[in-house]
Amino acid sequence: TGDTGRTGRELVTVTSIDELAESAERFEGRIVGIEHGAGIMARTREALTAYGLGGRYRILETSEPRMLDRLAAAVQRRQWIVLTGWRPHWIFELYALRFLDDPNRVYGGEESIHTMVRRGFAEYAPEAYEVLSRASWHPEELERLMLWIHEGDGDPYVQALRWMEVNDETVDSWLVADE
């Protein structure tokens, strides 16, 4: 499963998007986002209208790395920040973030991530197909692996092996068919 929306750090007392208007000054009237064409950015522009935030906030469209740099700087300085966020993402493993409630459901509800394989894969590699059909991740597990890749030597294979060692019971459940 995954989510998209606005996130705020634990020191931030705002818990809902509809509370942002009264705290515009604390957030410096800025919502930090990613590239203009991203779906989450279109929803953020809709949210400005839906929640009447247009006159109080502007969206800072950057890149994901720049958004993450701004988040790191705000955390270090203990400043309030609101940004576009989604799960799974390693920032949720590294920082104490939360999604703001979205009473108008501009961002929708919980989303899902599905494994997809090419047509005929089940016949071509039935054992691999069975493992993939049993594999299930919680966002927190995937975020931990993503953080290890981000912070580690950058080799996803090495970090995946590390994750498998730490989570051997989970991996075993993927490898053994239910009786």
Name what the model sees in each region:
Residues 1-34:
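A conserved helix-loop-strand patch within extracytoplasmic ligand-binding domains
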Residues 1-11, 111-125, 148:
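A bilobed periplasmic-binding-protein/Venus flytrap-type ligand-binding module shared by bacterial periplasmic
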Residues 15, 19, 39-46, 66, ...:
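Extracytoplasmic/secreted proteins, especially bacterial periplasmic and envelope-associated proteins
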Residues 17-22, 28, 46-57, 79, ...:
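Metal- and O2-centered redox machinery and metal/ROS homeostasis
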Residues 22-25, 49-53, 72-76, 133-137, ...:
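Sec-exported extracytoplasmic/periplasmic mature domains
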Residues 35-102:
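Ligand-binding pocket segment of bilobal, Venus flytrap-like solute-binding proteins
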Residues 65-66, 88-139:
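Periplasmic-binding protein-like
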Residues 139-179:
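C-terminal functional modules
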